[in-house]
């Protein structure tokens, strides 16, 4: 195996600490070609699709990408922002918010982001951080609940990149924060902030809050993946923080792909059932998504909304994700600070009051 050439650093640039936020990824453009390229990388990951590679690649290349690329491109085009992909835009704002918060608290820490699929990719960003003098790097997945198909594959990509390095940095990883008090408080603050602006559902009259998490195949639960349990844990803590019961609040799973059974209940059919049952208002919030993206804006805000209204529901609200909300940036700073303990960052724990 050939190792990467190490470039000499000036002494002033060395011995730095870095935080790398990692999210799933996004196409570079809302075009069929860009979307096919992105989906080919995403759906070729054996952590995502656990089917023998040879068989799966035939199915993927011949039957999925030619058709799904065009359909998905139209969906991406419907949510694309002037600045680019919503996920990329919100992730960049999270980086800026965290960077600002840490700076206010006298942290001398580099903060950047990478995408597991698409650009900027994890190997490229690790190399960039090394060139900036980072000898200690914290990998911070933006997935609060651990899953092999999200968190683990992000770490896989980082460790593969490390294999090529002659001079490896020290690495720490954040495995999950599904029950972290600051994360739960940020979720509750986001929901309450939305309700303050748009009115609170009339739960006494039967209105519902639906907490929709990204789905995964049920087989992964049977094989020992903790994702389902951690989603339920987050939902229970959030319901408690909001003062709601399981009658007023439902937990569902979205974005099913293929014909295999996934974690249930499914989001879209649940909203259709609620509309048909006479529920007047349904609010949907996605606690597992730390930034708005195709799955929250288009799938929830458009497709699921239509299912609910066409079934008989009257009022639908898609509550925005955490994005760069002050409470979330403060929580992110608290979680990061806890995992940076013992490294030379020259500061104390960030304070939420530091964020405007």
UniProtKB/Swiss-Prot annotation:
Identify the main location: cytoplasm
Pfam families reported in the protein's UniProt record: Ferrochelatase
The protein's location, in the record's own words, is: Cytoplasm
What is the reaction catalyzed? heme b + 2 H(+) = protoporphyrin IX + Fe(2+)
Pathway the protein contributes to: Porphyrin-containing compound metabolism; protoheme biosynthesis; protoheme from protoporphyrin-IX: step 1/1
What top-level class of enzyme does the UniProt entry assign? Answer: lyase
Query: Binding residues for Fe cation, per the UniProt record?
Result: 214, 295
Lineage, top-rank taxon, reads Bacteria
Q: Give the GO biological process terms.
A: heme biosynthetic process
Q: What is its EC number?
A: 4.98.1.1
Which terms does the record give in the GO molecular function aspect? Answer: ferrochelatase activity; metal ion binding
What Gene3D superfamilies would the database entry show?
3.40.50.1400
User: PROSITE patterns, alphabetically?
Assistant: FERROCHELATASE
A Gene Ontology cellular component where this protein is annotated is: cytoplasm
Q: What does this protein do?
A: Catalyzes the ferrous insertion into protoporphyrin IX.
State the family named in the UniProt similarity comment for this chain: Belongs to the ferrochelatase family.
The name on file for this protein is: Ferrochelatase
Q: Which organism is it from?
A: Paraburkholderia phymatum (strain DSM 17167 / CIP 108236 / LMG 21445 / STM815) (Burkholderia phymatum)
Tell me the organism's taxonomic lineage.
Bacteria, Pseudomonadati, Pseudomonadota, Betaproteobacteria, Burkholderiales
């Amino acid at each position: 195996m050939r190792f990467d050439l190490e470039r000499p650093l000036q002494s002033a640039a060395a011995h730095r600490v870095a935080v790398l936020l990692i999210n799933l990824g996004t196409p570079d453009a809302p075009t069929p070609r860009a979307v096919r390229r992105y989906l080919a990388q995403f759906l070729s990951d054996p952590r995502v699709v656990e089917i023998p590679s040879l068989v799966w690649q035939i199915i993927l290349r011949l039957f999925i990408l030619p058709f799904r690329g065009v359909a998905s491109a139209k969906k991406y085009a419907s949510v694309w922002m002037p600045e680019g992909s919503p996920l990329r835009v919100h992730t960049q704002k999270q980086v800026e918010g965290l960077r600002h918060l840490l700076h206010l608290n006298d942290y001398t820490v580099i903060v950047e982001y990478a995408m597991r699929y698409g650009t900027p990719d994890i190997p490229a960003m690790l190399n960039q951080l090394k060139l900036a003098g980072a000898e200690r790097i914290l990998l911070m997945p933006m997935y609060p609940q651990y899953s092999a198909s999200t968190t683990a594959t992000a770490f896989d990509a980082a460790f593969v990149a490390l294999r090529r390095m002659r001079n490896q940095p020290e690495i720490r990883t954040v495995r999950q924060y599904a029950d972290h008090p600051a994360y739960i408080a940020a979720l509750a603050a986001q929901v309450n902030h939305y309700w303050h602006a748009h009115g609170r559902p009339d739960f006494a009259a039967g209105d519902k809050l639906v907490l929709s998490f990204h789905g995964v195949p049920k087989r992964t639960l049977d094989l020992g993946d903790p994702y389902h349990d951690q989603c339920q844990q987050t939902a229970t803590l959030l319901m408690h923080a909001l003062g709601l019961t399981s009658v007023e609040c439902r937990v569902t799973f979205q974005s099913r792909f293929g014909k295999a059974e996934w974690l249930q209940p499914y989001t879209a059919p649940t909203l259709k059932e609620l509309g048909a049952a006479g529920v007047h208002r349904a609010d949907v919030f996605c606690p597992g998504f730390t930034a708005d993206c195709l799955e929250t804006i288009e799938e929830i805000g458009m497709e699921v909304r239509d299912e609910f209204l066409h079934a008989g529901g009257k009022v639908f609200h898609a509550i925005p994700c955490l994005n760069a909300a002050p409470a979330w940036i403060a929580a992110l700073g608290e979680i990061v600070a806890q995992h940076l303990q013992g490294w030379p960052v020259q500061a104390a724990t960030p304070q939420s009051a530091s964020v405007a």
